[in-house]
Amino acid sequence: ALPISGGEDNIEIGNPGWYIVVVKVTLEGRNYKYAVDFYKPEVYLTGDTSGGWDSFTEANMFTVPEGKGEFVSPAFVASGEVRMCIKLADIDWWKSEFIILGGKIEYRGTGEDQERAMGNAGQKAYLNFIDNKGAIK
């Protein structure tokens, strides 16, 4: 379990670091109900550059920086479109997809496919979520 606890209005994180925060909103009668979940910061490379689709294994996972720094993908096993995401239970991966365009992390959200960034075998993706920048090199 993650070192997170909370009271009525506060969330306390026992260990500083990177987390994925998911906020779910439901409507109960005329009131909104909010649920906040915390997950490990598991970011994945998927698609041709990872060797296949829907393979969310440790081999396709980015390294997580200590403190400030970059998340770094494994080396691309093939050339092609660079596709990245987080994987949440019961959510299609592409709904949490993001890519690198013009040196920035661009999130897909609910839209259509984005313009693609290409990578070559042996390269890696570098993501800095603090300043929303990314690179393929």
What are these regions (language model features)?
Residues 1-137:
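Insoluble glucan recognition modules
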